[in-house]
Amino acid sequence: MAQAHLNPVIASHLVEIKAEENPDTRVYVFERGEHGEDVITYRDLHEKANRLARLLLEKGIKTGDTFGVFMRNYPEFVYSLVAGTTIGAIMVPIDPRSRGDRLKYLLTNSGAKAVIVSIECLEQLEEVLKDVPDLKFIAVAYQRDLGMPVSPKYHALNETLEKDTWETVDQMIMDVRQPMEIIYTSGTTGDPKGVAIRNNRTGLFNILNMIVWKYKKDDILYNGLSLTHGNAQAVTLFPALALGITAVFSPRFTKSRI
């Protein structure tokens, strides 16, 4: 039975509840083209996010700190989101096309103390590192289908996610008003503006589904937009998580895949 103190409005609490009730339910599928797909169950999501939460704590990231997530649509994006809500750290999703002044601005304006980056975005990050002195830690997610070499300068996130044993992290926040993310606007009329998204937004997404989307239990959702955008999270990521239906994600937007 799920622990009574868990609040399903908080994403990491919801994942823990679902992992106990329906551990093998396929909740997310990440397409890999000719390399197949990554299928993520509630158990996978809970365990790997918890491993990542432990890593963040060990690297000095604590409740209220911000950390960037800079990648295409990969499983590590969702692990990062759930890990952040586990410890009360605030995730800053960064569009994988960002570079130069825009990337530097997003990292400095948000006060990010760490970045979780996929390997194909690492070069863009390295170009601005000298101008982002407050970063404490960088973890790199290597994608098997890209075949890019491991950099010895940074922590390989894959090693953490694949651990057989780790010191589990208990849920560290209970206040649904605690910020979950800072999502930045496009900045078409000036610098991008950071919008704080509280944990109670998860509950609002569920209400939106009941009123607007009205997904059914046998529906399969598809998303080709970047998960760094609020629309992709509201329409596919969070509804699938709450309802136990499958959402399929493409790593990047291409018109030919729609």
Where are these regions (language model features)?
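A short N-terminal helical cap/helix-turn-helix that marks the beginning
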Residues: 4-29, 47
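Conserved pre-ATP/AMP-binding loop-to-beta segment of ANL
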Residues: 8, 23-26, 139, 164-184, ...
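Conserved AMP-binding/adenylate-forming core of the ANL superfamily
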Residues: 24-74, 78, 82, 99-104, ...
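Conserved AMP-binding A3 loop
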Residues: 39-43, 180-205
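Structural core segment of the AMP-binding/adenylate-forming
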Residues: 58-59, 86-159
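A short helix-loop-beta submotif of the ANL/AMP-binding
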Residues: 65, 72-92, 96-100, 108-114, ...
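Conserved AMP-binding
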Residues: 71-74, 95, 215, 225-229
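Conserved AMP-binding/adenylation subdomain of ANL enzymes
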Residues: 203-220, 228-258
